[in-house]
Amino acid sequence: MKILKQIPDFCLSHWLLRIPLAIVFLQQGISKLPFSLDDADSWELPYLVWWFVVYGEIGAGIGLIFSGIMVSKIAGDYIWDFWIQDLGDLLTRFSGIVMCCIVTGVIWISEPASFWDVILYDNLHVFLWVGGLFFALRGSRT
């Protein structure tokens, strides 16, 4: 037990999950720009839904990075206020919820044969969904 107490705490470990998840969502959202009605039609989605998907992916990626900066001491002591931490926590949770909604829609549109097909063969979307769910449930208290 003494050995475990000697291991230093790495309080910035949430960045190891936050950065790759944000990059994937930013990359997917930016790759859809400029979006058009033809893009939405190719996925058989209404234009408004496609608009929310594109800006949701970009916003969730930016929100996840920005909220991490808001709750860390990277931002500096002058904005290290209580309400900034709460706002950062809410932004993290909202970004996670948006990620879960978008990935759920992607899985739904792919029309898998069963739940097990998603779990066994759609690993990327399962990991993106679980990553979004992690931040939605934990917020910035990681």
What are the roles of these predicted feature ranges?
Residues 43-47:
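Short, structured beta-strand/loop micro-motifs enriched in basic residues and often containing a Trp
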Residues 1-34, 38, 48-142:
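Extended, low-polarity transmembrane helix blocks
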